[in-house]
Each structure stands twice: as structure tokens, then as C-alpha cells.
Swiss-Prot record:
GO molecular function, one term: ATP binding
Protein's name according to its UniProt entry: Valine--tRNA ligase
Catalytic class of the enzyme: ligase
EC number per UniProt: 6.1.1.9
Coiled coil: 883-953
Residue ranges of the motif 'KMSKS' region: 560-564
Residue window of motif 'HIGH' region: 48-58
SUPFAM superfamilies membership: Anticodon-binding domain of a subclass of class I aminoacyl-tRNA synthetases (SSF47323), Nucleotidylyl transferase (SSF52374), tRNA-binding arm (SSF46589), ValRS/IleRS/LeuRS editing domain (SSF50677)
Protein residues bound to ATP: K563
Provenance organism: Haemophilus influenzae (strain 86-028NP)
Cited function: Catalyzes the attachment of valine to tRNA(Val). As ValRS can inadvertently accommodate and process structurally similar amino acids such as threonine, to avoid such errors, it has a 'posttransfer' editing activity that hydrolyzes mischarged Thr-tRNA(Val) in a tRNA-dependent manner.
Claim: Plastid is one of the keywords in the record: no
Reaction(s) this enzyme catalyzes, per UniProt: tRNA(Val) + L-valine + ATP = L-valyl-tRNA(Val) + AMP + diphosphate
């Protein structure tokens, strides 16, 4: 009848995953086909930090990307997943600085720039492959031969090209403006690297004496100025009030004497001032506050910088005009007592001196957010420094229009509003960083400080006609990491060369990323790409057609995962498993705070008492896809992961059941498809339709759900059972039909599920392919199932649906009445429609086999029925006679005890939830859990009461 076939009892992911991946990679299956007649499909991966390691966010986004890549490859598209890593300037430099400090007791300055950069390249060579290897473990079908690094020669050339061209167009300039300054790391940092920490501070109320005998409306000769930053008051160049604040309108245009510094500064009116904050009078320090900087520009105020790059008080103030150039003629001497003081020491002294002069009005407690550098760990300072800037407004206008016109779609659409709000209020972008690791700015200076911009020094001399005797020194700064990653989609494809890859794969199709970098990365990619990449008609190209924005992966309590919270989960641990001891070491091993380490250890022991079991890559991927509801943050759920590992096992066991069935007959000959055969093929066709529609809308959760629902609830729970009577009692034609249907539906199901769960589907498919006459090497290159327009069998679907309802009703009667599954029952129908009577007539044998029935009878309209338990299916009444099956009194006594037990539980929880003290103190999650239990007990109680009534009526 069929070949003898053996298959392991269980699927063992660790035994097959890495070998399968190696085979795929070595066979070149991840490479584009480069078939110019096929549509191209390309995704550029958001480049992770080269020295980093994979976290759950990476695993989540990359699973979604690989699903799309595998799907499009199976669709026959010329598919490229462009991978690579980011040099991650400040992060990588700090890792290596800490390393040499710990191991050698040295700083980067001990090495010097060139030697230190070589040290970083060594570190990159040593650790840079970690994340690539971890990405392989996820099953990512990446063309690794095309892997790029943001400081590769090719990408470095692209960076220089963009810088030089923008400079030539007047869109890059050097100027002195206010930036986020990290006084520990001595570099400007981006807003993304600033962490605003809640802090309990103070609001100091200082008296600033009015000059020239002026008085307030209530006769005072001073204004009370509220500030959270006394240490910068030596740099005040005005005090401001709201123009409509009647308390101070008469003083606008007059002056106050700045205490301690003894210089007069004007009283100005500006709508920036909040009349309700403090006294409604604020000091304006344009050199040390971003809001004040804007006020200063509006009122043409001088900028007085009183801090050094270490955030100490300067010996001499630096006076700058609103044009960023030194300003002559403005006196702002720093009193000798404060020179050289560290900023917070200066704060204490200034407050004490105000008090000594009788000018400290009051101090109020004040909650505020203090900006910290996320790498340096100290409060950042708004600082006037010389930096390079991109004038981005002209680039932003084009980038806004691309989204407005629908050339780029955001999914979910609401993120367009976030994009527009940022882009329409865009400021010039500070692109220089005071670091050593990164793309060094292609600008050179001569002895007089003249600036020359070109791709290299040789070009500088040629472009500006400089003699070899002119000594040139390259700018020490490097570019913001976001500058090079902004070129990612086109620089990785060979730009500025017009390569065949650029022509074939650009624009890319979709970008999958987090909402937090829409401005820092997504917007800049759109701006740069549209400025530099044009199609054959000269029209600006977008970098991607769709931006799919994911939420964050949080822990089970909804907390953001972070090392300091000790709740980080490593995706590799989900795949391979990890012991409790190793997990504790991972979470607390390098912690300097013993109390925090103990708190984390306690929580970890409670949550993972036995460590984390191995689940395999497919279970992890399926879970991530199933949780991917559009744009929402996701609370990780270990139970879902276990459930989807069980799902993978279910798929394996079902395949084993099919392929090891000794009665399977795939020989040539007459075939007679049963109702069940027609139904499962129609259901599969519908599942393909659901999957394709869902994927086109980036609803990965619905894709996973469609596969789960079909595999578990239709194929395994029903169809496999429906074939058993055929193999037991069917004729040869029916057995051949069931055999063909089983193996063909299974093979197509594996292809359908492959983009989500690549390893188990490949492993099973290698065993199935011989049964369906396929000789190809890999499921990866097989066509993805199509929706067959004529493949929907509505009649079969309706008939099986009715039969399933009847079978479930009979099984429920058995369970509720404690009748063993092995005992045959009689089934009576009353009020059966003509349509359902026809189904019953054709499928009586199937119904008897599936519901374990001895007799099936349709009662006439007025025919009396024996004492029976009844269920409704639609309008039809199903009756199962109970004579001889149960001891009525004993069963009622047992159910009475059950009812009492459930009633007591419901009452206990009701009392708990009506206790105001409990509800006020208990966490929301605990209350929700109690309500869940209450609903479960209430539902159980109602079911038992129904059973009681049914048996009482016998």
C-alpha cells in the first residue's frame, strides 16, 4: 500500500536548527535570484550596534522582517534582506575606554587617537560577530556576503560624498549654538541620548533690585525671580515677564541690577513666560537654557557663557551675539569668588551669598526633570560650543510632502502625525561629536583657522589651490552616528556609484522599526535619500515605501526591560534555555549595588524557579508574531511561549501520524473524496486567503492565529479524526482520497507556515516531499500557497460545521453526565430541518463513528421521547436517553456538593472584592486576577447547575 516510514517521537530543535541554517546559508538560498524579470523585494535591516548583543526588541522586529522576506522569496520575487551593523560612536568608544581602564589602567589619551582607534577595530573584530551569530540563531534568511558596517570603506566614501555635497550647497555650516553637552564625556549628544530623570529639587526665589528708583505696582523696589538653576544666574542677560501680566506691565523696558555681578539687565516681555510659575518673573540666560536661547534670539540679547566644558565656573565670561560670533562691548565680569567652582558648589555659594545679602526671598520644594546623559550618567548642560550643523528645513519640506502624498505609508497610520509634528518644527541638526570613534569630519584648517571641506586632503589642496607648504590639520570631531545611518538604504547598495543593486533594490519596500527613532533615523533617511537618490527621470526616490512601526516588548508586568530593573530576557535563552543559576549571574553578576542585586535575584527566583526551559527558535518566532498587534506595546508572556512550543509539537505529531500511517495509500487508481476531504481543502484555501490578506496589512498576529487555528482546531482536532473511520472501514477509492488529501494539505500547510516557523517546517517538509512527488532541495524555494478561486466548497463547510456542532453536543452530554467515551449512546433528533435531515441521511455512518452512537433516530412531530438529556443545535433538539446510564440519586448528591463548593468560592471572592481596604491597597493586576477567578467560578457554577437540572428532569 505505501512505503514504511519512521519519524522521531518528538521534534528536537537543538538537534536540527543550526545544521539546517548552515545548509541554507552554504547553498546560497538567502541570496537574491537577480532575475531581472522578477519583481524585486528588499528590506534594509535597522543596523544594530556592532558590539552589542541581541535583545527581545531585535528578535521581535527581525522575526517580522524575516517573515516578509521568506514570504516574498517563495512568491518568486528577487529578494534581498540587506543586513549590517552600526559603529555606534559613543557606545562603542565607551565600551573600549572602560575595557582599557579596567584591564590596563589606561585612558584613550595614553594611547593617542590613532592607536586607540586601532584598539576599537580590534575590539570590533573580536566581538562584532556576536550579534551576527545570534541573528543566525533566529533563522534570519540574510545574504551574509552582503553584510555591511557603517565604517566600511564604501560607506565611508558615501558619508564624505554627502557631507561635501551638502557643504557645497550651503546646507552644512559651522557655528556656535546651544547643544546638549555631556561635561563628563566632553561631547555634544543627541536628544535621544538624554534621559530626563524625575528629581526632587528646589525653586529659589531671589530678589533682583530694580534700577534707577523704579518700583513695582505694590511699592517694592525689587522683583522676585524664581529659578531652579542659581548657578547660571551670573550669565543672565534679562528678566522676563508675560506681556499681559498686569503686575509688571509698567516695568517692561526698565532694568534690574543683577545681584553678585552688579550689572544692569533689561526687563523684557515675552509670551514664553508662564504667569502661574513661581512669581511670574523668570531670569533669561540664553547661553545656558534652550528656551532662554530662543527668547534671547527673539529679543537680540547677548549670550553670556559662564561655564567651562567641565561645567565649572569660568574665569572670564564668553560673550556671544545672536549670530554666534564674539560680541564686543558688553561687560560681564565673573566675580573672583566663583571662578573655578564646580557647578553645584557654585550653586551652594550663590544661594548662601544671596541669603547673606538679604536677597533670598524663599525656597520652595519643586519636582523637576533633570536631563542626564545616558552614557556619562551626569546632568547635561545646555552649552554654547562650535559645532557643525545641517540646515535641514529644505530637506524636510520634500520629506514631509512624500508622506503627505502617500509615497511613504506609516503603519499604523497615526504615526504620520508624530512624524509631521517633528518635521514641521524641525531645527538645524548638530552633526559633530567630540569623539574619536566615528566618521571624521572631512574638513581641514590652516594656521589662520580658514576651513576647507573636501573628500580628502589631496582634494582640498587641488580644490582650493593650496601649496604643499600650507600646513593643514583635519577637524578632530566625528559625525553623529545618525548621519551615516541616515544613508543606510542607498549606501549599502553601492551609492554614489550607480550600481545594478541600487537600480534593482532601491527604493526598499518596508522599514520595520520602533517609534522612538522615527525622528532620529526614519526622518533623516527620508531627507537624505530624497536629496541624493533620483530615479531615471530625475525624480527623488524614497528610501522605503512603508514604515511599519512596532511597539516595545515589555516584561509580563508591563515594565520596560532594562538591566537596572533586572528584567531583561535574552531571546537566545528562550531558544536554548538557561538554568536559574546562570540567569541570576546574567542579571546580577556585575552589579555594584548589593541591595538592588538581591531584590532582582529574589524576583528572578520567584518568576523562574526552575530557570527557563528550551523552547526552540520556531516557538519564539511564532510567539513574537502572535503578539504583534499593530503598534501596541507587548507584554511578554512565557505561557504563550510554552503554548506555541506545544503547537510546534502538535504539528510534528500530526505529521508523524499522517506519514507513519500504515494504511496510507498513494497509489494510482480511482479516488472518492469524502465530505471531510472537501471540507479540509476548502478550510485550507480560506486560511491561505486570511494569511495573505493579513500579511498585506502587516497583521502578523492574524497570520499566526490563522495558522494556529487551522492546524490545531481544524486539521488536528477534526480532520485527522474524521479520516480514522475512512481508514478503518472505507473502500479503496475513499482511502486513496483521504491519503492524498492528508499529505497534500500537510505539504501545503508547511509551505504556508514556513515564513513564520522555518526550521520545523523544513524538517517535516523534507520527510513529506517524497510522498507528494517533489524532488526540490528546500521548502524555502517552493511557491507560497495561492488562493484558489474555485477552491471554496461552501456546501462541505456548512455540512461539516453542523456535524461538528452535533458531535460536540453529544460529547458535552457524555461529560456532564459522567458517561464513559467507550459506551455507545442513542441519539434522537426533534425539530430537524429538511436541510439538516439530508445531511444526517448522507452522513449517519460518520456521525455514529465520531460520536460513538449505537442508533440515530429522527422523532416525528408528535412522537414522545423517553427521559433524556437535551441540547439545542440551532433549532433542532438533541436527546440522549439516559436509562441505565446513571444512578440518579447518587449523581444529584454528588452535584449538590459541587454546587456548594463553587457557591462558597464565589462568595469568598465577592467578599474580598467588596472589601474597600483590599481594593485600595492591592495592585491592579491582583484585583484583575481575583475578578478573573470570580468569573471562572461563576461560569463553573452555572454549568453544574445546568447538569443538576438535566438529571433532575430524568
Amino acid at each position: 500500500m505505501t512505503q514504511k516510514f519512521e519519524m522521531a517521537d518528538r521534534f528536537n530543535p537543538s538537534a536540527v536548527e543550526q545544521a539546517l541554517y548552515q545548509h541554507w546559508e552554504e547553498s546560497g538560498y538567502f541570496k537574491p535570484s537577480e532575475n531581472e524579470n522578477a519583481p524585486s523585494y528588499c528590506i534594509a535591516i535597522p543596523p544594530p550596534n556592532v558590539t552589542g548583543s541581541l535583545h527581545m526588541g531585535h528578535a521581535f522586529q527581525q522575526t517580522l522582517m524575516d517573515t516578509l522576506i521568506r514570504f516574498n522569496r517563495m512568491e518568486g520575487h528577487n529578494t534581498l534582506w540587506q543586513a549590517g551593523t552600526d559603529h555606534a560612536g559613543i557606545a562603542t568608544q565607551m565600551v573600549v575606554e572602560r575595557k582599557i581602564a579596567a584591564e590596563e589602567g589606561k585612558t584613550r589619551h595614553d594611547y593617542g587617537r590613532e592607536a586607540f582607534i586601532n584598539k576599537i577595530w580590534d575590539w570590533k573584530a573580536y566581538s562584532g560577530g556576536t550579534i551576527s551569530q545570534q541573528m543566525r540563531r533566529l533563522g534570519n534568511s540574510i545574504d551574509w556576503e552582503r553584510e555591511r558596517f557603517t565604517m566600511d570603506d564604501g560607506l565611508s566614501n558615501a558619508v564624505k560624498e554627502v557631507f561635501v555635497r551638502l557643504h557645497e550647497e550651503g546646507l552644512i555650516y559651522r557655528g556656535k549654538r546651544l547643544v546638549n553637552w555631556d561635561p563628563k564625556l566632553h561631547t555634544a549628544i543627541s536628544d535621544l541620548e538624554v534621559e530626563n530623570k524625575e528629581s526632587k529639587g528646589s525653586l529659589w526665589h531671589f530678589r533682583y533690585p530694580l534700577a534707577n528708583g523704579a518700583k513695582t505696582a505694590d511699592g517694592k523696589d525689587y522683583l522676585v525671580v524664581a529659578t531652579t538653576r542659581p548657578e547660571t544666574m551670573l550669565g543672565d542677560t534679562a528678566v522676563a515677564v508675560h506681556p499681559e501680566d498686569e503686575r509688571y506691565q509698567s516695568l517692561i523696558g526698565k532694568t534690574v541690577v543683577l545681584p553678585l555681578a552688579n550689572r544692569e539687565i533689561p526687563i523684557i516681555a515675552d509670551e514664553y513666560v508662564d504667569r502661574e510659575f513661581g512669581t511670574g518673573v523668570v531670569k533669561i540666560t540664553p547661553a545656558h537654557d534652550f528656551n532662554d536661547y530662543e527668547v534671547g534670539k527673539r529679543h537680540n540679547l547677548p549670550m553670556v557663557n559662564v561655564l567651562t566644558l567641565n561645567a565649572n565656573i569660568r574665569d572670564e565670561a564668553e560673550i556671544i551675539g545672536t549670530d554666534g560670533k564674539p560680541l564686543a562691548g558688553y561687560e560681564a565680569t565673573i566675580p573672583a569668588d566663583y571662578r573655578g567652582l564646580e557647578r553645584f558648589a557654585a550653586r551652594k555659594k550663590i544661594v548662601a551669598d544671596f541669603e547673606a545679602l538679604g536677597l533670598l526671598d524663599e525656597i520652595k520644594p519643586h519636582d523637576l526633570k533633570v536631563p542626564y546623559g545616558d552614557r556619562g550618567g551626569v546632568p547635561i548642560e545646555p552649552m554654547l560650543t562650535d559645532q557643525w550643523y545641517v540646515s535641514v528645513k529644505p530637506l524636510a519640506d520634500v520629506a514631509i510632502k512624500a508622506v503627505e502624498d502617500g509615497e511613504i505609508q506609516f503603519v499604523p497610520k497615526q504615526y504620520e502625525n508624530l512624524y509631521f509634528s517633528w518635521m514641521r518644527d524641525i531645527q538645524d541638526w548638530c552633526i559633530s561629536r567630540q569623539l574619536w570613534w566615528g566618521h571624521r569630519i572631512p574638513a581641514w584648517y590652516d594656521a589662520e583657522g580658514n576651513v576647507y571641506v573636501a573628500r580628502n586632503e589631496e582634494e582640498v589642496r587641488s580644490k582650493y589651490n593650496l601649496d604643499s607648504a600650507v600646513e593643514l590639520k583635519q577637524d578632530e570631531d566625528v559625525l553623529d552616528t545618525w548621519f551615516s545611518s541616515g544613508l543606510w538604504t542607498f549606501s549599502t547598495l553601492g551609492w554614489p556609484e550607480q550600481t545594478k543593486e541600487l537600480k534593482m533594490f532601491h527604493p526598499t519596500d518596508v522599514l520595520i522599526t520602533g517609534f522612538d527613532i522615527i525622528f532620529f533615523w526614519v526622518a533623516r533617511m527620508i531627507m537624505f535619500t530624497m536629496h541624493f537618490v533620483k530615479d531615471e527621470n530625475g525624480k527623488p526616490q524614497v528610501p522605503f515605501k512603508t514604515v511599519y512601526v512596532t511597539g516595545l516588548i515589555r516584561d509580563e508586568q508591563g515594565q520596560k526591560m532594562s538591566k537596572s530593573k533586572g528584567n531583561v530576557l535574552d531571546p537566545i535563552d528562550m531558544i536554548d534555555g538557561i538554568s536559574l543559576e546562570d540567569l541570576l549571574e546574567k542579571r546580577t553578576g556585575n552589579m555594584m549595588q548589593p541591595q538592588l542585586a538581591e531584590k532582582i535575584a529574589k524576583a528572578t527566583r520567584k518568576e523562574f524557579a526552575d530557570g527557563i526551559a528550551a523552547h526552540g527558535t520556531d516557538a519564539l518566532r511564532f510567539t513574537l508574531a502572535a503578539l504583534a498587534s499593530n503598534g501596541r506595546d507587548i507584554n511578554w508572556d512565557m505561557k504563550r511561549l510554552e503554548g506555541y512550543r506545544n503547537f510546534c509539537n502538535k504539528l510534528w505529531n500530526a505529521s508523524r501520524f499522517v506519514l507513519t500511517n500504515e494504511k496510507l495509500d498513494l497509489s494510482e487508481g480511482e479516488i472518492e473524496f469524502s465530505l471531510a476531504d472537501r471540507w479540509i481543502q476548502s478550510e485550507f484555501n480560506r486560511t491561505v486567503e486570511t494569511f495573505r490578506n493579513s500579511l498585506s496589512q502587516y497583521r502578523f498576529d492574524l497570520c499566526a492565529n490563522a495558522i494556529y487555528e487551522f492546524t490545531w482546531n481544524q486539521f488536528c482536532d477534526w480532520y485527522l479524526e474524521l479520516t480514522k473511520p475512512v481508514f478503518a472501514n472505507g473502500n479503496a477509492a475513499q482511502i486513496r482520497a483521504a491519503s492524498q488529501t492528508l499529505v497534500h494539505v500537510l505539504e501545503k500547510l508547511l509551505r504556508l507556515a514556513h515564513p513564520l516557523i522555518p526550521f520545523i517546517t523544513e524538517e517535516i517538509w523534507q520527510k513529506v516531499k517524497g510522498f507528494v512527488g517533489i524532488t526540490a532541495d528546500s521548502i524555502m524555494l517552493q511557491p507560497f500557497p495561492q488562493v484558489e478561486e474555485n477552491g471554496f466548497d461552501l456546501e462541505a463547510e456548512a455540512e461539516i460545521e453542523w456535524l461538528k456542532e452535533v458531535i460536540v453536543a453529544v460529547r458535552n452530554i457524555r461529560a456532564e453526565s459522567n458517561i464513559a467515551p467507550s459506551k455507545g449512546l442513542d441519539l434522537l433528533f426533534r425539530n430537524l430541518s429538511a436541510e439538516n435531515a439530508k445531511i444526517l441521511e448522507k452522513q449517519t455512518a460518520l456521525l455514529k463513528a465520531m460520536a460513538k452512537l449505537d442508533n440515530v433516530q429522527v422523532l416525528a412531530a408528535n412522537e414522545a421521547a423517553p427521559l433524556a438529556v437535551a441540547k439545542l443545535v440551532g433549532n433542532a433538539e438533541l436527546l440522549v436517553p439516559m436509562a441505565g446510564f446513571i444512578n440518579k440519586e447518587a449523581e444529584l448528591a454528588r452535584l449538590t456538593k459541587e454546587i456548594e463548593k463553587y457557591q462558597n468560592e464565589v462568595k469568598r471572592i465577592e467578599n474580598k472584592l467588596s472589601n474597600e481596604s483590599f481594593v485600595a491597597k492591592a495592585p491592579e493586576a491582583v484585583i484583575a486576577k481575583e475578578r478573573e477567578k470570580q468569573a471562572e467560578y461563576q461560569s463553573g457554577l452555572e454549568k453544574i447547575q445546568e447538569q443538576y437540572k438535566a438529571i433532575e428532569a430524568l
